[in-house]
Swiss-Prot record:
Entry EC number(s): 4.2.1.152, 5.4.4.7
A single GO cellular-component term on record: membrane
Chief place of localization: cytoplasm
Protein name in the entry: Hydroperoxide isomerase ALOXE3
Subcellular location field: Cytoplasm
Domain PLAT: residue ranges: 2-119
Record family assignment: Belongs to the lipoxygenase family.
Catalytic reaction(s) noted: a hydroperoxyeicosatetraenoate = a hydroxy-epoxy-eicosatetraenoate; (8S)-hydroperoxy-(5Z,9E,11Z,14Z)-eicosatetraenoate = (10R)-hydroxy-(8S,9S)-epoxy-(5Z,11Z,14Z)-eicosatrienoate; (12R)-hydroperoxy-(5Z,8Z,10E,14Z)-eicosatetraenoate = (8R)-hydroxy-(11R,12R)-epoxy-(5Z,9E,14Z)-eicosatrienoate; (12S)-hydroperoxy-(5Z,8Z,10E,14Z)-eicosatetraenoate = (8R)-hydroxy-(11S,12S)-epoxy-(5Z,9E,14Z)-eicosatrienoate
Phenotype caused by lack of the gene: Mice die within 5 to 12 hours after birth due to defective skin barrier function loosing around 2.5% of body weight per hour. Dehydratation through the skin is increased 4 folds. The outside-in barrier acquisition is also affected, the skin remaining permeable at 18.5 dpc while it is impermeable in wild-type mice. The stratum corneum is more tightly packed while other layers are unaffected. Hyperkeratosis of the skin is observed but it is not associated with defects in epidermal differentiation while the ceramide composition of the epidermis is altered with an absence of ester-bound ceramides.
């Protein structure tokens, strides 16, 4: 008689335990054990519990290949899900085999687990294990299916595929959702207290293993409801018309101020702060260094000489690499939208900036269209104060549109969703790349589904607050993806290509490159352990299918993007994985976390403009300026969104935090520890630097970076 000892750990999530019966079967090279119930005196499989059981066999099973968990009904109780963290099996000879699980087991089913040792398909030769890989991927591909949201968009998860699964896989709360109004058959409706329609059905059927935890869901709701109801009670969400005074905007979130939001309120109209935001604001990727001026921006030396001062000229500064351009060409053909029944307006400005001898980036000239001419004057710092302020505000509106739609949602949320989907569909649990990337996909499918249900749906928040609306968003993102390249995706390459390596006080660049290097070193150690040669990469058909699916579904097979459709060397794999992890974590933090800080003062980030751009100088008054800014209710709706997305809900996992131990070998565990130590040193350096800054830059402080796109 051979006795195997099982140590079963149940997750500590709310309702992670189960009353259902759990049975186990061990499968080894010499046979398999009888199906045996895991039962002991008292409650089994309670949340957070660690319990030990015995499985008896007539003879030893040899090397353990699989552990089957069978979940079946207990008496008359209703079925409930069980979150199994991990199981350790100790053989009669004392050797231990670890089985990571870290998933919800829902309904009555059988789940097969492999030992925690990561293996590529080339390292498996047993038909049993090869068949297990194949069946696992077939099941996942049936569950996680691709869907087209709009032409030219990265493909997204098809939530309806979860609805088609058996009823015990659904999260059915339809009858518990209080709906104030439903005026169509799509499920697009208003909820009490929320200022936009929500696509309810798409939120109710998330597969358990990609759904927010109860803690995160509760935290998100508790962040949203008080702010939304507070505005509703004060009548702000229903108040149309212009702001009477700029100072009135201060009172929207009087209890939700931050040091940075207060700093922005005090300094937003200063030219130096306008330039600072191109380096360390929420969209720090727009600047390109110029060696000559584009013909569409006919700025002359006489125009800017008063700012440049004696001893230099525009041509000299161009040759020195001190002139930069922010070009919003992508907005030139963007459709416009109506808000509160009124036509809104969009411009495609060109903003020329100069790095002065003191290392301060200053705006030199602004043209509010892509076509120069008498009706498109070039605004200068020497113009009257309100004319110059209005021109800068138009640029800030363009910044808002490009940042929110492309830099933020397209390049982090949507692309990271495609990475998550391909990882789930093409890599089995035992694959080393799956183990590496899984923590960086956490909650991404859920948060993007929420975004599509609340922001991108018809009459959702995008239609309520932005000058381009939902149709403009679709245009902007599809155009942005058509021009997005692998160089843009890889931070070091992007920095070099944009010519911004030497700008001082560019904290996003400095902190980002440090984090990139730390991730690259960590990934390199993992890859070298599992892929010792070029052939090991080229012959991994699962890895190649994963890369190919990302190329086809995220980048629509566009060769000009420069994204690989196949990987040939470990070095190429390291760069690709580094870029994915960086963009799922650090890049998202850089472009997301500061939205409330920099947008709470609405004139610094207006979501829409209500008057056409000026065609002459000298006509701007404070009244006309206020009449150009968004209306009161539009402002409040947008600031509510800024507040929510800047407040990371509970259940956070900072970059480098891996509580789920998917890697069980010693080498990758040591690499994880070294990665964490490196991030700790980066954090220490950032905090020391910030002590001497008037406005600290903390968005890339590793403890403040979430592992994944989860909000």
């Amino acid at each position: 008689m051979a006795v195997y000892r099982l140590c079963v750990t149940t997750g500590s999530y709310l309702k992670a335990g189960t009353l259902d019966n759990i049975y186990a079967t061990l499968v080894g090279t010499c046979g398999e054990s009888p199906k045996q119930k895991l039962d002991r005196v008292g409650r089994d499989f309670a949340s957070g519990s660690v319990q030990k059981y015995k499985v008896r066999c007539e003879a030893e099973l040899g090397e353990i290949l699989l552990l089957r968990l069978h979940k079946e009904r207990f008496a008359f109780f209703c079925k409930d899900p069980w979150y199994c963290s991990r199981i350790c099996v100790t053989a009669p000879d004392g050797s231990a085999v670890h089985f990571p699980c870290y998933q919800w087991i829902d309904g009555y089913c059988t789940v097969e687990l492999r030992p925690g040792t990561a293996r590529t398909i080339c390292q498996d030769s047993l038909p049993l294990l090869l068949d297990h890989r194949k069946r696992e991927l077939q099941a996942r591909q049936e569950c996680y299916r691709w869907k087209i949201f709009a032409p030219g968009f990265p493909r997204m998860v098809d939530v309806s595929s979860f609805q088609e699964m058996e009823s015990d896989k659904k999260f059915a709360l339809t009858k518990t959702v209080p709906c104030a109004e439903q005026d169509d058959n799509s499920g697009n409706r208003y909820l009490p207290g929320f200022p936009m329609k929500i696509d309810i059905p798409s939120l109710l059927h998330m597969e358990p293993n990609i759904r927010y935890s109860a803690t995160k869901t509760a935290s998100l709701i508790f962040n949203a409801l008080p702010a939304s109801f507070g505005m509703k009670i004060r009548g702000l969400l229903d108040r149309k018309g212009s702001w009477k005074r700029l100072d009135d905007i201060r009172n929207i979130f009087w209890c939700h101020k931050t040091f940075t939001s207060e700093y922005v309120t005090e300094h937003w109209c200063e030219d130096s702060f306008f330039g600072y935001q191109y380096l360390n604001g929420v969209n720090p990727v727009m600047l390109h260094c110029l060696s000559s001026l584009p013909s569409k921006l006919p700025v002359t030396n006489d125009m800017v000489a008063p700012l440049l001062g004696p001893g230099t000229c525009l041509q000299t500064e161009l040759e020195r690499g001190h002139i930069f351009l922010a070009d919003y060409w992508i907005l030139a053909e963007a459709p416009v939208h109506c808000i509160n029944g009124l036509q809104q307006y969009v411009t495609a400005p060109l903003c020329l900036l100069w790095l002065n001898p003191q290392g301060v980036l200053l705006p030199l000239a602004i043209q509010l269209s892509q076509t120069p001419g008498p009706e498109s004057p070039i605004f200068l710092p020497t113009d009257c104060e309100l004319d110059w302020l209005l021109a800068k505000t138009w640029v800030r509106n363009s910044e808002f549109l490009v940042h929110e739609n492309n830099t933020h949602f397209l390049c982090t949320h949507l692309l990271c969703e495609a990475f998550s989907m391909a990882t789930l569909r093409q890599l089995p649990l035992c694959h080393p790349v799956y183990k590496l990337l899984l923590p960086h996909t956490r909650y991404t499918l859920q948060v993007n589904t929420i975004a599509r249900a609340t922001l991108l749906n018809p009459d959702g928040l995008v239609d309520k607050v932005t000058s381009i609306g939902r149709q403009g968003l679709i245009y902007l993102m599809s155009t942005g993806l058509a021009h997005f390249t692998y160089t843009d995706f890889c931070l070091p390459d992007s920095i070099r290509a944009r010519g911004v390596l030497t700008i001082p006080n560019y904290h996003y660049r400095d902190d980002g490159l440090k984090i990139w290097a730390a991730i690259e070193r960590f990934v390199s150690e993992i890859v070298s352990y599992y892929y010792p040669s070029d052939a090991s990469v080229q012959q991994d058909c699962e890895l190649q299918a994963w890369v190919g699916e990302i190329f086809a579904q995220a980048f629509l097979g566009r060769e000009s993007s420069g994204f690989p459709s196949r990987l040939c060397t470990p070095g190429e794999l390291v760069k690709y994985l580094t870029a994915i992890i960086f963009n799922c974590s650090a890049q998202h933090a850089a472009v997301n976390s500061g939205q409330h800080d920099f947008g709470a003062w609405m004139p610094n980030a207006p979501s829409s403009m209500r008057q056409p751009p000026p065609q002459t100088k000298g006509d701007t008054t404070m009244k006309s300026y206020l009449d150009t800014l968004p209306e009161v209710n539009t402002t409040c709706r947008n600031l509510l969104l800024f507040w929510l997305v800047s407040q990371e809900p509970k259940d956070q996992r900072p970059l480098g935090t891996y509580p789920d131990e998917h890697f069980t070998e010693e080498a990758p565990r040591q690499s994880i520890a070294a990665f964490q130590n490196c991030l700790a040193q980066i954090s220490k350096d950032i905090r020391e630097r910030n002590q001497s800054l008037a406005l600290p830059y903390a968005y890339l402080d590793p403890p403040l970076i979430e592992n994944s796109v989860s909000i």
